Every structure is written in C-alpha cells, then in structure tokens.
C-alpha cells in the first residue's frame, strides 16, 4: 500500500446524534474510523494518521500525525458532539498540517466524514478543491446522513480535486446497513486492508471481539515495526553506507529549515568551515610526524658512540649478572674489524 500521511476529519456536529444509522451517525462514524485507521497503519508501518474534529468552536487537531494505532483510536473516541461543521476551514488546516509532515515521502491525503449540511456553496468548494489539487493533496469523502443536500456540492468538489483517480466520494444513504462494511468494500480502503475481512466487528454488538481485534492489530503493527528496525540496524551495522543513508535526510531537512533564517544558515556555514580547518590541522600534524620519527636515528648514533667508550662499556658489562665481559669485547672487536674491512673494500672499488 502507498506510503501516506492521512488526516481523518470527523463530523462532530449536532446532526451526528440522529439515529438513521445503526446505532447513530456518531457511533457508525466511530466504527468506520477504527476500520480506516487500522487499515492505514497496518498496510504500511511507515504511514501516519492524524485525527481532526470539524465542528465545535473551531476545527481542531485531536491527534497529530502518528503511527501508534492506540493513540489514534483513543483520540477518535474522545470526540465531543457540538455545533456545526466548518468544512472549508477544516480542509485548510489539514492541508497546512500535511505540508509540515516530517516525512516528505508520505503522500498527503485527507479523509472527511460529512454527516451534516454544508454551509459552503458549490463555487466555494470548487475553489477549495483547486487549491488542494495544486498542492497535491488527495481527498476522500464519506457522504452520509444529509445525502440529498450535500451530494451535488461534494460531487463538484471531488471532480475538481481529483488527480489520477486518487480522490473518491462515497455516498451512503440511511438504512439498516453498517457504514463500516460499505467503506470496507470501497476504494477508500485499498486492497492492502483486505486482511480485515468482510466480517468487521461492530464494537457495540460485540465489544470483546472488537477489543481483541484492536489488540491483535496493534501487536501485528508492533511486530512489523520491530522487524523493520532490526533490518535497518543490521544494514547500518554491516556497512558504513547504511549510516550515511540514515543521516542524509536529517542534513537535508536542516538545509530546508535554515533557508528561512539567514543568521542560522551563516552560523552553520561558519561551524562547518571551522570543522574543516580542524580536520586540515590534524592532517597537517599527522603528516609532520614522519620527519620527527626520522630524527630518531641520531639517537641511535649517540648510543653506538657510548658503546665505543671503554670505561662505559666495562662498567655496564660488569653490572650484568652471568655475562663474561671479555667475550663481549672480543665479539665487538671482531664486528668492528669486519666493518673496517668492508670500508676498505668499498674504497678500492
């Protein structure tokens, strides 16, 4: 499944109290959110999900982009019903949050649940869609509840935001069906989530099974994450290239962040220049060491001259236990004669 950063926007307006979905629009939405978030996090361990509310005093980010399924589901459960939705403002806030995602390789996506009337006109939604498309943000919308009033507007919105069939509109009329089951078989939940099966558990009808499913999904995600980290550590420990690959994105991110602050950029450049000077200095010291080592031979010459001193030689040999000074003297004299003979032969040549 595609590596994505997904912001799920939830309708928490007063309209969500209606009971035309089982058991209510709000509860049906919660079940569907559980399905979508589990699908996104399980299909790719690097994908991240965020939760936003669309109603109340203002749209609000409840959970920032994260890969922790338990944190995502917990934030969705804390949603409070209040006021009317502000669809346009929600889309703009979500787009801004996606622009500042940490992993730029993640494809930005917004999934919005719309279960109450939209205050925006069709023209306003079209303009909003064009801005989202320009910034490469894909949008999926689940239109349920107020289908008659919102369908025309949302169809126009999706038509303008759609790029390479990456955006989708799912319209679900009220009825005895379960919202999450319909979403499960729609393009919004891609084939990578087929592991959940068509028998997705309703948390209200069977809470024990729903909790077991949630825990198993979380354990599977943690297992995949451990395997991924183990592979990265193995690759990084075996070769130096792995370390270089790991640190490179951090350096590039620093360059991007410093572009807006010339003083920080200058300080970074100066520090890098200082590091280079220190490296060059250490290299120069290393290169200068061999000449110092070459100066050691004169010390050897001095020691050889000392051995030519008879008094020094006698005192040294006499101080050594078990050593016959006369034998040592004879050996040294023989060596000296051989050296003299070699010198004479060289002079004749």
From Swiss-Prot:
Pfam families in the record: VWA_2 (PF13519)
Alphabetical list of SUPFAM superfamilies matching this protein: vWA-like
Complexes and interactors: The 26S proteasome is composed of a core protease, known as the 20S proteasome, capped at one or both ends by the 19S regulatory complex (RC). The RC is composed of at least 18 different subunits in two subcomplexes, the base and the lid, which form the portions proximal and distal to the 20S proteolytic core, respectively.
Comp. bias (Basic and acidic residues): 219-234, 335-349
UniProt-recorded name of the protein: 26S proteasome non-ATPase regulatory subunit 4
Disordered, as annotated region: 219-257, 274-349
Biased composition (Low complexity): 235-253, 280-301
Biological role stated in the UniProt entry: Binds and presumably selects ubiquitin-conjugates for destruction.
Signal peptide extent: none
Gene Ontology biological process: proteasome-mediated ubiquitin-dependent protein catabolic process; ubiquitin-dependent protein catabolic process
Residue span(s) of domain VWFA: 5-188
Gene: psmD4
The entry's keywords: Proteasome, Repeat
UniProt key word Chaperone: no
Residue span, UIM domain: 204-223, 259-278
Cellular compartments per GO CC: cytosol; nucleus; proteasome complex; proteasome regulatory particle, base subcomplex
Organism placement in taxonomy: Eukaryota, Amoebozoa, Evosea, Eumycetozoa, Dictyostelia
Family according to the record: Belongs to the proteasome subunit S5A family.
GO molecular function list: polyubiquitin modification-dependent protein binding
């Amino acid at each position: 499944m595609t590596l994505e950063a997904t912001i799920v926007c939830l309708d928490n307006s007063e309209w969500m109290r209606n009971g035309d979905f089982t058991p209510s629009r709000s509860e049906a939405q919660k079940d569907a959110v559980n399905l979508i978030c589990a699908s996104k996090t399980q299909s790719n361990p690097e994908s991240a999900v965020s939760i936003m509310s669309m109603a109340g005093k203002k749209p609000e980010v409840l959970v920032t982009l994260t890969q922790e399924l338990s944190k995502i589901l917990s934030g969705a459960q804390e949603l409070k019903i209040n006021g009317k939705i502000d669809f346009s403002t929600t889309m703009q806030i979500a787009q801004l949050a996606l622009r500042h995602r940490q992993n730029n390789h993640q494809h930005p996506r917004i999934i919005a649940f719309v279960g109450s009337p939209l205050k925006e006109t069709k023209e306003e939604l079209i303009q909003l869609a064009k801005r989202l498309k320009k910034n490469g943000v894909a949008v999926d919308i689940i239109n349920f509840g107020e289908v008659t009033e919102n369908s025309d507007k949302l169809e126009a919105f999706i038509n303008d935001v759609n790029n390479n069939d990456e955006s989708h509109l799912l319209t679900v009329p009220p009825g005895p069906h379960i919202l999450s089951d319909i979403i499960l078989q729609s393009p919004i939940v891609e084939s990578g989530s087929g592991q959940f099966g068509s028998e997705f558990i309703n948390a209200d009808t069977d809470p024990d099974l729903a909790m077991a499913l949630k825990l198993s999904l979380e354990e599977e995600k943690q297992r995949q994450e451990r395997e991924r980290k183990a592979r990265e550590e193995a690759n990084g420990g075996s070769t130096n290239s792995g370390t270089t690959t790991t640190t490179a994105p951090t350096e590039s991110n620093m360059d991007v962040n410093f572009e807006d602050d010339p003083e920080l950029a200058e300080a970074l450049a100066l520090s890098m220049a200082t590091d280079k000077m220190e490296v060059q200095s250490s290299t120069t010291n290393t290169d200068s060491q061999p000449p110092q080592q070459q100066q050691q031979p004169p010390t050897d010459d001095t020691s050889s001259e000392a051995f030519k001193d008879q008094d020094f030689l006698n005192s040294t040999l006499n101080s050594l236990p078990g050593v016959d000074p006369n034998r040592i003297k004879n050996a040294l004299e023989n060596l000296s004669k051989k050296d003299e003979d070699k010198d004479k032969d060289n002079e004749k040549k």
